[in-house]
């Protein structure tokens, strides 16, 4: 099936959303935990988290325009620069997906979904207790994308909590062993079953 630029612009809204969200392939599924200035814990699923560098250790995630729809995660991070990124496992993927529902800011998705929060080392934002990979983040900067008014939120990793058996001797995290979810589109969840690791590549000698 071929879609021209004009075809894409004229697609039915939901079809276009699903098509464009899934055409780039699988994305990580993560829950971001944050706390409002009034102490309400927020939990929201994201599929846009990306690695930005290892030294310093930076992760970013994208937000749709904040001027149109309130983004509680964004508002909380502006009030409290600490937040968490947590893996999603098969046993609670349904609960994790429900955090995409648009509740009022004073409602905690932890309470609604019965996902248990966890506080580690006095970190000022809640982790997800059931997650195998828990990342403590501190907000660094935001970059506005003028073309569609989205924002890239950049944070620094300040704490890592990972199940011991998932970490290889070289630092690789075997997410397959924990049945960590990926997302295709907006609502298609998959669980990679194996890893195929390749060595560091150098130019071939002629």
Please tell me what each predicted stretch does.
Residues 1-206:
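Basic, polyanion-binding surface patches
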